[in-house]
UniProtKB/Swiss-Prot annotation:
The proteolytic activity of the heterodimer of A and B subunits requires Zn(2+) and Ca(2+) ions. The lineage of its organism: Eukaryota, Metazoa, Chordata, Craniata, Vertebrata. The keyword Nucleotidyltransferase does not apply. Heterodimer (A and B subunits): Zinc metalloprotease that has fibrinogenolytic and hemorrhagic activities. Cleaves insulin B chain preferably at '40-Tyr-|-Leu-41' bond, but also at '28-Gln-|-His-29' and '34-His-|-Leu-35' bonds. Hydrolyzes effectively isolated extracellular matrix (ECM) bovine fibronectin, and only slightly, basal membrane (BM) proteins human collagen IV and murine laminin, in vitro. Cleaves nidogen-1 (at '350-Ser-|-Phe-351' and '380-Tyr-|-Asn-381' bonds), but not laminin, in a solubilized BM preparation. Hydrolyzes plasma proteins involved in blood coagulation in vitro. This is Zinc metalloproteinase-disintegrin-like protein H4 subunit A.
Amino acid sequence: MIQPLLVVTCLVVFPYQVSSIILESGNVNDYEVVYPQKVTSLPKGAVQQPEQKYEDTMQYEFKVNGEPVVLHLEKNKGLFSEDYSETHYSPDGREITTNPPVEDHCYYHGHIQNEADSTASISACNGLKGHFKLQGETYLIEPLKIPESEAHAVYKYENIEKEDEAPKMCGVTETNWESDEPIRKASQLVATSEQRRNIQKYIELVIVVDNVMFRKYTGNSTAIRTRIYEIVNTLNVVFRNVHIFVALVGIEIWNKKDQIKVKSAESVTLDLFGDWREKDLLRRKRHDNAQLLTGIDLNEQTLGIAPMSGMCKPKSSVGLIQDYCKSYLLVAIVMAHELGHNLGMDHDDGNCICREMPCIMSPEAGSKPAFYFSDCSWNQYQKFRNDIKSKCIDNKPLKTDIVSPAFCGNYFVEEGEECDCGFPGNCRNPCCNATTCKLTPGSECGDGECCDQCRIQTAGTECRPAWDECDVPEYCTGQSAECPTDVLQRNGQPCKNNNGYCYNGVCPILTNQCISLFGSSVTVAPDRCFNNNLQGTENFHCGMENGRYIKCKPQDKKCGRLFCVEPPTGGGINCKSIRSEGDPDHGMVDLGTKCADGKVCNSNRQCVDVNTAY
């Protein structure tokens, strides 16, 4: 093992306690002044790349509560996608999109040396700013604004004065997840080598900033970008525990005016934002999920809202987050919570536990920040990711898609690496040498769906079963540890005895959608129930345009709200439908559903010829 050579230029850090100060995170009652000293940490023979402004790895030493600590930092590789873009608007309303260079950024993850379960999320752009975990406590660090000084403030999260003691909560109130799997203990949330196959997921995220937030930061786009980068850097600390990486693919700032009506009524704004994403943003920017950061106060102490299991759906893969406090950390935790809803996670109840309470999916913001998902959330997420509709987060970035220089220990296999299982103290993969990111002697592979006990599986071994008759199975080639690219039956191919047509790997039919919503006793309602969709109201419609609900045309009525009926028991029929405040697509007919012979519902909720729909 290569031992790093540590050279400390100055070990005297002069900490002292101060009673109260106003910092970027707010009014802090008790903090410590420290002077972090950079420690040179280069393996013997290593050479620092001169063209880099920000090193791939750094170490700083300072004191906390009188005890020296060493903060290890490694650059967050993959924080930005290769096609990262920023969009704002000209005075006449034109979109202006740029692709700024982000290769040599200043955002890091890390840990405290010799501290179990320690994590850190730090920006090193102008001094050290961020948070770290030490002995079970969350500390924040930020530079003090003293000219010609390296002084920083270090303080516990609990010492930040709360601006408003009223309970803050999530706006998702209607959830109906039911478990058909045993709840796993928190200690079981570490994946085994078998479970790691096909478990890593990737969310390509766009964050949109509304006009009120733009004005809240006095039009300072640099400050807004910095806040967003800090939020996404923290998201990756949180989601690493459930094997998800969040890559920022774009920022859009509504600097001139909002592109939708942003209202305090969170469910209305969420619905409008989802509609805008589907009809505007998705058509010009590839991404998996979009979150709207707003500067307005949402109703009823709500901090955020997102559709349950909305990830990958054109209209529902969205969230609405209030930029409610000065601390980026707390806003990041709210966004993590709403992304959890997008990934199928319900609110935790009293039976749910996590490594450190409170858990991310608690329905109310607690007195301390949450960093871990519960056992309940893990099970719900497993159920969601086993649904073919979640496949947009499966695509693994190519090695060349990671724009920063390669770094061994960041869990990404990059150019020049054969494997990457994290730092030596965290690596649990017997196939991979964590120090060199090379395979161990005798190993053929380190990970992948076609890697079993460090050996590439033989050709013909099934690595991805067919989910549906509209999917096809994939088999190992015998040459690679990765399962071949997922292949689906063509859209429009007849399925389920000609009762439906294939759409993105599934066979959506009205009968199954009714059973999913109301149980096995229901059937599809007669046509007269679907006539309600001709109204164009909040409950019965064929979508939304410019903030108004669209009346379904008679030929399109089976592409709007879904109607089902119970078995007749005498008397008239009862047209059953369902609507969710938090999920605009919940209870609507699925896209690709057969609406007439030879016709399917398209993304505009029109019943069109199946041969021209795709």
